[in-house]
């Protein structure tokens, strides 16, 4: 067998492995949103060393979402680190017919985010950082308002804190000693989206 033929067969084998890796990647595809990219400098003896930071939101669009922060010398590497960090902090978000079960408020540092349920067809009424988190989580109808700090990192984490505080209507009703119908509209309860037990617990990627 000639060297060219061996090289050709070797290339075919390598291509086969690449194809298998591609098929595996499709099974774990997620929605990724880059919220912010910043260049930072570190002063050292020889001068300044520049690097990039990336704030990334990752979700499956079906109630699973996480936020990550990556830092590297190049933008793509910073984003990749942010994606991996976000996957380590996945958590489940309770949803009912594409919206949230009840109003909620999240705070992080000086950032405050208010979220309220909305009727089907309303859409995501939110600014960029809040919208990124909600869309990755699979929330399609919601009203939001950001107060206090305009820092994107604080706003994103305030949104995450708000989502972590969400509960299923049954849990809220049991705690308050009320019928479920008084906690959430009957129309939403009828068309609710089932969420696995332990919605507030983090899950591995």
UniProtKB/Swiss-Prot annotation:
UniProt record, GO biological process: translation
InterPro entries xref list: Ribosomal_Su5_D2-typ_SF, Ribosomal_uS5, Ribosomal_uS5_bac-type, Ribosomal_uS5_C, Ribosomal_uS5_N, Ribosomal_uS5_N_CS, Ribsml_uS5_D2-typ_fold_subgr
Biased composition (Basic and acidic residues): 9-24
Gene Ontology molecular function: any one: structural constituent of ribosome
S5 DRBM domain span: 30-93
Region (Disordered): 1-25
Gene3D superfamilies, per the entry: 3.30.160.20, 3.30.230.10
GO cellular component, one term: small ribosomal subunit
Keywords of the record: Ribonucleoprotein, Ribosomal protein, RNA-binding, rRNA-binding
Keyword Transcription regulation recorded: no
Record note on quaternary structure: Part of the 30S ribosomal subunit. Contacts proteins S4 and S8.
Domain remarks in the Swiss-Prot or TrEMBL record: The N-terminal domain interacts with the head of the 30S subunit; the C-terminal domain interacts with the body and contacts protein S4. The interaction surface between S4 and S5 is involved in control of translational fidelity.
Family of the protein in this entry: Belongs to the universal ribosomal protein uS5 family.
Alphabetical list of NCBIfam families matching this protein: rpsE_bact
Its job: With S4 and S12 plays an important role in translational accuracy.
HAMAP family from the UniProt entry: Ribosomal_uS5_B
Name of the protein in its database record: Small ribosomal subunit protein uS5
Protein's organism: Nocardioides sp. (strain ATCC BAA-499 / JS614)
GN (gene name): rpsE
